[in-house]
């Protein structure tokens, strides 16, 4: 879940709020998934779907805004490719439900925060944190 503010008929990232959170929480590190625009893939109806040019631009802009905010607030940044954390947890080829189930199993205190399918990003964030902690010998 990312905080947003109105921007005409759309919404955009609230980087001021993200910066305020970084000051309040004073994290040792920020782990950001190194994502890319969605390629053309088959949809449930068999039709191919992909991210359009405008969507790709907005997605890339939001990714850049998050990274810039983290760097501007002097928080060490770790970029994590989805393949890295998914392979670490044996989730190659998994879907969002499997990722969420594993996060809740490994980190039971996360369960109240991952109750809906749309909360898969929270599960991903938990697993990325676990990937980093394992990599650093923290777990």
Where are these regions (language model features)?
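Phosphate- and other anionic-substrate recognition elements at nucleic-acid/protein interfaces
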Residues: 1-139
